[in-house]
Amino acid sequence: MILEFESHLRDRGETPEGMLWIPGGRFRMGSEDFYPEESPVHEVSVPGFWMDRYEVTNAQFERFVAASGYETLAERPLNPADFPGAPEENLKPGSMLFGKTGRAVDLKNYTNWWVWAPGTNWRHPRGPRSSLEGLELHPVVHIAYEDAEAYARWSDKELPNEAQWEYAARGGLDGKKFTWGDEEFPDGKAMANSWQGEFPWQNLLRDGYEGTSPVGSFPANGYGLFDMAGNVWEWTSDWYVARRGNEVKACCSPEMSPRVATAEQSYDPGQQQFRIPRKVVKGGSHLCAPNYCLRYRPAARQPQMIDTGMSHIGFRCISSQPAPAGLHTR
């Protein structure tokens, strides 16, 4: 579905509302210490850009929908041809919803905690009978890739590529495990909305939240950006490949904010029946736990089918608008 939206961004040269300037520079992208898809570490050069200070909220997305009449993918019926053999119930409009289990389960089978929930979408984020009451400042969820793109176009912005996102998330702390340093709980303090305890059945709520949290509830990183770790995963514009292999240069030869792979390369080899491209999502979420998904780190990356929104995936935007005159852009 292609829609044309009227841009309402300010005149060029002004500071984009709600955004921060991320000065360009070089950094070491990736990690060798956690999951194989994060390697190899390689040096990347990223020009400066603007980035949303916060993840896009329900209130912001509601204004977009009111102005544009946009309907998200989760609100539209599914095409049976795209899902051969799927039960009729699963073809109704809906989204993937997390369900906490009552006991320890097989962590290799995600269907133990993810269910297709008809009637669930961004307006009803916790199931078909839920609402946005009290969630206005929480990140919008159940957003497929094209939904995030549509919002970005309407805002005269775009989605970050993976290198831009990771560079911004690090906040100037090159090579650190987390967006705030190497210690997960400095001085015993929770720095992000993640899962403490045994996923997916025991959440100790050390950070104070069972699900998503209002944006900005945890400390900002070195660039002043909030929730670059945890809360919700965030879409990037890059197609997913199971890390770079020989597609990247050596660490001593920096790339310019690389975009690699094609849609065809991003298909899931383990699900040949679904020829659905996948994008990279970054940042981890409130469902990430050390025993299952220690991915609330800047180097972490996951594939996500572009047609699927979930209760732990949102986004933020960037802008290539020039920096204000006199601002140090290095």
Residue ranges with predicted function:
Residues 1-13:
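N-terminal pre-domain segments of enzymes
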Residues 7-9, 36-41, 108-110, 267-269, ...:
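Short, P/G- and charge-enriched loop/turn segments at secondary-structure junctions
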Residues 21-22, 28, 32-33, 77-298, ...:
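Functional-site microenvironments in short loops/helix caps that host divalent-cation chemistry
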Residues 43-49:
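A short N-terminal beta-strand-loop micro-motif at the entrance of redox/enzyme domains
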Residues 49, 64-73, 155-156, 323:
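Short capping motifs at secondary-structure boundaries
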Residues 52:
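An anion-binding catalytic pocket shared by soluble metabolic enzymes
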Residues 57:
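Acidic-aromatic/histidine active-site loop/patch
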Residues 311-325:
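Short, structured beta-strand segments at or near domain termini in extracellular proteins/domains
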